[in-house]
Amino acid sequence: MLKPALEPRGGFSFENCQRNASLERVLPGLKVPHARKTGTTIAGLVFQDGVILGADTRATNDSVVADKSCEKIHFIAPKIYCCGAGVAADAEMTTRMVASKMELHALSTGREPRVATVTRILRQTLFRYQGHVGASLIVGGVDLTGPQLYGVHPHGSYSRLPFTALGSGQDAALAVLEDRFQPNMTLEAAQGLLVEAVTAGILGDLGSGGNVDACVITKTGAKLLRTLSSPTEPVKRSGRYHFVPGTTAVLTQTVKPLTLELVEETVQAMEVE
């Protein structure tokens, strides 16, 4: 049956929700896929000498902590690194693909790759898959145009900013960055601000945790700092508790005899020549 063409209205459309509910009623045993929440806090900012990137180290599988010391800062080029949030496999393989392309590009042209080139390849690749590659990336590096920082989203959109944060803990991290960021910060001040931003994401989000990793990129090279800070130290137990028998009163007691049926078995030894 034909329907009149109407102008799309703004807001959330519940057509797919009604469709999924109808399919669940008609097809017994059908499991409608649900959106998977991924947890990470990644951040980056530009300071006077370059770019500094930071990330937490927790990898989760739904509500289970799969890895407490996961590396989320990926190598792209000697002066370009990338932080990955979202699906760990998608972020890992996407950054590996771009790193190999940048190596071939450097060998064929004889020039160092630019940060804008890396960002362009990433956003074109992610846009091609229309968000099915769940990788949110922060690209930072230093080239002949100076320090640059980009945020790339899973659907291919991007933005160039002096500071940014992505992941499930981005709200807490951005609150710290927006409050304390200043242009032309020193390395010590930028490093302290980055640690505070990622720590805020770790403490404010259950999907983020572990330690704080960082990567400092300048025109002379990059330095990866593993376990720069450990905001969530394990709590030490005060001691073990011992309770003597009779501490807890027994109110009722019931004894049920268990009948067992004895079965006789004969074992025949194997003849060995």
Swiss-Prot record:
The keyword Glycosyltransferase does not apply. Residues 1-39 form a propeptide. The active site is at T40. It is found in: Cytoplasm; Nucleus. Coiled coil: none annotated. One of its GO terms (biological process) is proteasome-mediated ubiquitin-dependent protein catabolic process. InterPro entries: Ntn_hydrolases_N, Pept_T1A_subB, Proteasome_bsu_C, Proteasome_bsu_CS, Proteasome_sua/b, Proteasome_suB-type. It is an enzyme of class 3 (hydrolase). The record marks G39, T40 as: Cleavage. Changing D56H: In IMD121; uncertain significance. Keywords: Acetylation, Cytoplasm, Disease variant, Host-virus interaction, Hydrolase, Nucleus, Phosphoprotein, Protease, Proteasome, Threonine protease, Zymogen. GO terms for cellular component: cytosol; nucleus; proteasome complex; proteasome core complex; proteasome core complex, beta-subunit complex; spermatoproteasome complex. Autocleaved. The resulting N-terminal Thr residue of the mature subunit is responsible for the nucleophile proteolytic activity. Belongs to the peptidase T1B family. The 26S proteasome consists of a 20S proteasome core and two 19S regulatory subunits. The 20S proteasome core is composed of 28 subunits that are arranged in four stacked rings, resulting in a barrel-shaped structure. The two end rings are each formed by seven alpha subunits, and the two central rings are each formed by seven beta subunits. The catalytic chamber with the active sites is on the inside of the barrel. Component of the immunoproteasome, where it displaces the equivalent housekeeping subunit PSMB7. PANTHER family: METALLOPROTEASE TLDD, PROTEASOME SUBUNIT BETA TYPE-7. This is Proteasome subunit beta type-10.
